Design a protein with these regions (language model features):
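Bacterial N-terminal signal peptides that target proteins for export
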Residues: 1-9
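Short, structured active-site-proximal loop/turn typified by the sulfatase FGly-forming signature C/S-X-P-X-R
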Residues: 45-91
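Loop/turn elements at helix/coil->beta-strand transitions in domains of secreted/extracellular proteins
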Residues: 30-34, 61-63, 135-140, 185-190, ...
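Metal-dependent active-site segment of extracytoplasmic phospho-/sulfohydrolases and closely related
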Residues: 36, 54, 217-257
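A long, amphipathic alpha-helix that forms part
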Residues: 166-180, 190, 197-238, 385
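His/Asp/Glu-rich, glycine-adjacent segments
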Residues: 86-205
Length: 408
């Protein structure tokens, strides 16, 4: 697997670590805690809507820019990329829904609690909390994908089982309570997750009143976190990211899969903003003939022929055939349309589409003030986190551009 040359990246980050530790007594590391916050579905340009004053202040007083999600621009693959620095094709969470020939009879899905907590799905990557725990640093995770499994045999010091009903205020309260521990027992790395913006974007579309309301609600929760830190005298580096953006979809922009390939030739696993397709045994050639050809508003490939720009197709969990529509077009069947009409918004589209760009924001003593960072791939967030936390890099696909632009 190709990787960014680790020697060069490690040297850059190590020099930063040394600079931050100069004249520090042995055995004492003054680094403040790092808090990683995900606002699921926060499109990069949402910051311009004028409904997030807390985030706007953090952006003015810190570093902010846009990041490009990894393919597919879905929730679980990109959340794991953010904390491992690996492309989905390398860390193994290649979709929200996937199969693995080494785990027969099981389909990984967000709703499959047994699969979500099974380390075998996650062990191809090393999230930063595992690296930190192995280095003797405490971590505390609130709802980050992967944190409910003992990845590579390691769990965070503290973590919570995902509960969508838990209010943003309660989530912030839990993070603040973790930080009330004595300095020697305080977590070095914490993560926090909010999904309301993504939910509203799916149901109502990215420019809807409901999205603005969800943005305001989430922004208020982050404001409470910042004030709570100040009240407790806790200085922290805060990194706010999103996993992907959101694009408008419409019933006028639908590609009917059942009009392209007969049902007996195979079955889709994922449909919508992209398609993963499994031909029926013995019908592979017919399925490929139907799908892997020219289509209006859609491109299809065998997994071995997916364009290199997507860094996707080598992992055993990638489906045999992948189809990607133009951004804003949805792949569906008559049956799926009866269950879920096409409306609102979606993601999973080409990560190079502007609508898929996600937020990056860094605030705290380690960040340059008033800096706009260049558009980078989201694998570059991981080296920033490693530098902040003070841990060695695990194997990753990230580069130094974001760290160089954002950090002092």
């Amino acid at each position: 697997m190709l990787r960014f040359p680790r020697a060069a990246l490690a040297a850059l980050l190590f020099l930063g670590v040394l600079a931050g530790c100069a004249s520090v007594p042995a055995g004492h590391d003054p680094r403040p805690p790092t808090i990683l916050i995900s606002i699921d579905g926060f499109r990069a340009d949402y910051l311009e809507l004028g409904v997030t004053p807390e985030l706007a202040r953090l952006a003015r007083e810190g570093a902010q820019g846009a990041i490009r999600p990894s393919f597919p621009s879905k929730t679980f693959p990109n959340h794991y990329t953010l904390v491992t620095g690996l492309r989905p094709d390398h860390h193994g969470i290649v979709d929200n829904n996937m199969r693995d020939p080494q785990i027969p009879g099981v389909t990984f899905a967000l709703s499959n609690r047994q699969a979500v907590t099974d380390r075998r799905w996650w062990d191809d990557g090393e999230p930063i909390w595992v690296t930190a725990e192995r280095a003797g640093l405490r971590t505390a995770i609130m709802f980050w994908p992967g944190s409910e499994a003992p990845v590579r045999g390691v769990r965070p010091s503290a973590w919570r089982t995902y509960d969508a009903a838990l209010s943003p205020e309660a989530r912030v309260g839990q993070v603040l309570s973790w930080l009330e521990a004595p300095r020697s027992a305080r977590p070095r790395f914490l993560a926090l997750y909010f999904e309301a913006v993504d939910t509203a974007g799916h149901h109502y579309g990215p420019r809807s009143r409901e999205v603005k309301e969800a943005l305001a609600q989430t922004d208020a929760a982050i404001g409470r976190l910042v004030r709570g830190l100040a009240e407790r005298g806790v200085e922290a580096n805060i990194v706010v990211v999103s996993d992907h953006g959101m694009a408008e979809i419409s019933p006028e922009r639908v590609i009917r899969l059942d009009e392209i390939v007969p049902a007996e030739l195979g079955a889709p696993l994922t449909m919508g903003a992209f398609l993963t397709y499994y031909p029926a045994p013995g019908r592979e050639a017919e399925a490929e003939a139907a799908l892997v050809r020219s289509h209006p508003h859609m491109s299809c490939w065998r997994k071995s022929q997916i364009p290199a720009a997507y860094h996707y197709g080598s992992h055993r969990r990638v489906a045999p055939i992948l189809c990607l529509p133009e951004t804003g077009w949805e792949i569906a069947t008559a049956e799926s349309l009866r269950k879920r009409p096409i409306k609102g918004g979606d993601h999973g589209f080409d990560p190079y589409a502007p609508e898929m760009q996600a937020l990056f924001l860094g605030y705290g003593p380690a960040f340059r003030r008033g800096t706009v960072t260049p558009l980078t791939d989201n694998v570059d967030v991981y080296p920033v986190l490693a530098r902040l936390v003070g841990v060695a890099l695990a194997e990753n696909d990230g580069g130094p551009a974001l760290a160089a632009a954002a950090l002092r």
